[in-house]
Amino acid sequence: MRGKFPAGRCGASAAPAVAKGAVEMAVRVHLVAMLVAAGLMLGGCARQSPQPSAPGAGAGPVIGGLGKSIHPFWDQVEKGMRDAAEPRGIQVEFYVPTKEDARKQAEKIKSWVAVGVSGILFAASDPETVGPAIRDAAARRIPCVAMDTDAPDSGRLAYVGTDNYEAGKVAGRVLGDLLKGRGKVCIATGSLTASNSLERIRGFREVLTKEYPGITVLPEVLVDNEDRAVAEQKAKAKIAAEPDLAAFFGVYALNGPACANAVKSAGKQGKIRVVCFDTTAEHMNMLKSGMIDAAVGQRPYLMGKKGLELVALIIEKGPEQALREMGAKDGSIDTGVDVVRREDVEKYRARLKQLGIPVEGW
């Protein structure tokens, strides 16, 4: 099932993606049973996706997908993975902790390594905590690809997702123009350890400092560890503490809606602006109602789809050829972003549908 790579390298060459023969079928039966057991051990604190189908139903290689928290963003990533996996005869086990928890992520990776999954597509909440588990997987010749948030020192073979530094700059310009170059801004995020959050904040601050000197970005960043209740409470407290606050910048998917709800509760909708990342159904509905002013839409479905396609291709052909065929640049595949304002919602929806990306709830 797993590609047989030369010692010391993860993915220099590979066995066929779908193994044949009675011996390997027995191995598959054993693997799926162990995956089920591993899932049960970790299931009390996380949303565990349905287990792979029985080997008799056409079982193939198993690829683990690791998200960061329970949220519709990760539902889209999972769907992208499963849509790419089905025609390839690949099984997907997708796992997210209830909220950001790098320790639980590392435990899950270790369980996948123990049962010998064929590949791993992961988003590390804290690369320092998750990195050792990924390095161990790589040492055992399991191809690992980072998605959404990069972990370049982890031993991963590639990154699939947003160029977060550039996307942060995009968000900064959107908010700078919205405020006409003046005002006080607060940043809210789910993490100050994940690289995607840090890179977005870096790009955002850099643009406002250089291009919008009349805007003040408050030094304190609100951090909620992707806990919605905490995010709203901290945003409400900041509104009370800063009566002249002009805007929130929501770095993670839950931050925009959380800040928007806090603004509405304070009776300051239209006075305090909200610019944020991501375009789930909740974001789109808040854009339509005016609670969110603009969203920088990532493409989570494509992260899952392209990420799985890349892992599968690495298993089949090795990393160098796989990255070349997937059009990677410097080991990365940029899935891009879209800026969506209230007037863009229906056009954006039509574009997603045309691309075959699921659109539900808005």
Annotate the PLM regions:
Residues 45, 54-59, 195-196, 207-209, ...:
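Hinge/cleft segment of the Venus flytrap/periplasmic-binding protein
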Residues 90, 116-119, 140-144, 155, ...:
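Loop/turn elements at helix/coil->beta-strand transitions in domains of secreted/extracellular proteins
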Residues 113, 122-138, 204, 219, ...:
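Hydrophobic alpha-helical
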Residues 113, 175-180, 239, 307, ...:
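Short, hydrophobic alpha-helical segments
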